[in-house]
Amino acid sequence: MGTFEKREKNGVTWLSATPFEKMEGIVQGFSTRLGGVSTEHLSSMNLSFSRGDQEENVRENFRRIADAIGFTPEDLVFSDQTHTTNIRVVTEADRGKGFTKPLDYTDVDGLITDVPGLVLATFYADCVPLYFVDPIRKAVGLSHSGWRGTVHKIGKITVQAMADQYGSRPEDIVARSGRAHV
């Protein structure tokens, strides 16, 4: 299963999947609610543009978590989660979608890529994040596993998508699940 350790930098707190920390080219983290600028019921690290927060607050929160973890927010690619098992193959053309460019896709609960520098982003409340890294093929995946996705085997579907797209072998993929918050 692997461990998640709490990390903090410049007042921003996140969780890091320790098995991935030493993997070359992998930058990852699971944000917490700590270290952002949002106020009131959205306090403080709100990363949703659809919850009624001011857009500049959400953008600043992304800048803060990006600086803490070590990526550029303009490299983000968002999912569009609707509790499906749909996986999107993310390419260079997707860079910034959801953050600097509008999404031009819907119903995507998993993202896979082999493009260095792209940052995949999925979002969670009480669902489970699934992380996938193929260190041989230099491919990664990230899936949102709610109860529907779990029942319909989104983890297996993500691994199969990586195999189909990048030639990943299941035995080479390092996978971790995050925690559900209920």
What are these regions (language model features)?
Residues 1-181:
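Active-site microenvironment for binding and transforming phosphate-containing groups
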